[in-house]
Amino acid sequence: MESKIYTVSEVTGRITELLTSDSVLNDLWITGEISNFHHHNSGHMYFTIKDERSCIKSIMFRGYNRKLKFEPEDGLKVNAHGYVGVYKPRGDYQFYVDHLEPAGKGALYLAFEQLKEKLEKEGLFNEDHKKEIPLLPRKIGVVTSPTGAAIRDILSVVKRRFKNVSVLIVPSLVQGKKAAREIVEGIEYLNSRDDIDVIIVSRGGGSIEELWSFNEEVVARAIYNSRIPVISGVGHETDFTIADFVADLRAPTPSAAAELAISNRIELEKHLVNLYTRLYNSVSYQIKSYRDRLNSLSLKKVLTRPEELFIQKIQYVDELSRRLDWAMEGRLKDAREKFRVLSGKLDSLSPLKTIERGYSITLKGSEPINSITQVDIGDVIRSRLSDGIILSQVKRTMKEGEQDG
């Protein structure tokens, strides 16, 4: 009997049928560690899920991975749901993932830690960037739900502590998919106004899922970029969100946020009285100190007979004047002596001294003649003597040793 020969595509199709007909492989949870993770420009994620002995290539299409709250990475242990199929062009079997979650840690918790680490490295939590909360704001902007308990608590505290302070409420969702965007828009709107001195971003307590809007990166960056100081008052005292780390001041509750935003009127009055008392005591001490110094100086001899101070100074000036005269006289004497010596040396080197000893200087024009080659027959020359000048005309020149014939 002759064996049937199959094409590669036929074999691949048969394998695909076997896999798709297996109910276990069509609805499957796999646990393992991610390796070779790659987030493609198309938005699809490619990675391998492995354990100690085996591995399986996996893909998570963009439509599914957009729902992830965390970013998969190499070394992360995960639980993945999907089905096993075949990629026919290469004949590879692979795992098509439609749901992915960290093994052991919740996806939201992991996303929180990843974003916190990222923003901290960027410097969004740095203390030197945080703005000072004004002592007594004129108007407070509040981004929160207009119907929640948080806004009622805030308004109650404001009324009790300093009822003259104005509050502008910017309504916003505080949970759900659209909440983060509305919170950002509320912060940006308050920054566009000129009458807001401080912003409170707030909501009541809840689960991590309910508070998640305040862990979104867009909210964190809006708080960081706000030119107006921002106080976060999210959840209960034990709840922490990314917004708390970025805010200029973190309050454990909405009520506490309002208390931190404005001073109690009675406390402010006490503070002003305390400042006045400290200022009064400081000025009084300075006055007493200056009075004591003045009294002490009035007892000194120099102030009972102040003319003695001037007499001593006059004598000192006279003494300095005499010293200056002596110094100048000595310098002039030295200078005169140096001038006399130099004049003598200069005089001894003068050509006129040579003339006085019986010599003469012969010139052609203004140039001295020191060789017979400098003159021609018929030239008029001048001889300088000690008592005058002789004009001569050259009739003949003779070299050294030549006889007059």
UniProtKB/Swiss-Prot annotation:
It holds the Pfam family tRNA_anti_2. GO terms for cellular component: cytoplasm; exodeoxyribonuclease VII complex. It catalyses: Exonucleolytic cleavage in either 5'- to 3'- or 3'- to 5'-direction to yield nucleoside 5'-phosphates. InterPro entries: Exonuc_VII_L, Exonuc_VII_lsu_C, OB-fold_nuc-bd_dom. Transmembrane segments: none annotated. One of its GO terms (molecular function) is exodeoxyribonuclease VII activity. Keywords: Cytoplasm, Exonuclease, Hydrolase, Nuclease. Its EC number is 3.1.11.6. One of its GO terms (biological process) is DNA catabolic process. The keyword Hydrolase applies. It is found in: Cytoplasm. It comes from the Bacteria. The keyword Transferase does not apply. Bidirectionally degrades single-stranded DNA into large acid-insoluble oligonucleotides, which are then degraded further into small acid-soluble oligonucleotides. Heterooligomer composed of large and small subunits. Belongs to the XseA family. NCBIfam families: xseA (TIGR00237). This is Exodeoxyribonuclease 7 large subunit. It comes from Halothermothrix orenii (strain H 168 / OCM 544 / DSM 9562). The gene is xseA.
